[in-house]
């Protein structure tokens, strides 16, 4: 009985160590902030065009089309 209890506790300890080393911890600074584009005009149809406007003219990391009420708007994104 002692041998099996010892074996079980060693096995559980190894399992916890494996779980602790493989668990991914996401850093807190990976948040994406978004704001409505000032330069994009009209309804946003192409996410690619939105991203180009946000990157080249507004100095953001990227952009995408998103529903803002009843219309699709260009939303610029960057890391917070």
From Swiss-Prot:
GO terms for cellular component: extracellular region. Disulfide bonds join 33-80, 44-65, 50-74, 54-76. Keywords: Antimicrobial, Disulfide bond, Fungicide, Plant defense, Secreted, Signal. The keyword Disulfide bond applies. Its main location: secreted. Residues 1-23 form the signal peptide. It is found in: Secreted. GO terms for biological process: defense response to fungus; killing of cells of another organism. Belongs to the DEFL family. This is Defensin-like protein 8. The gene is LCR73.
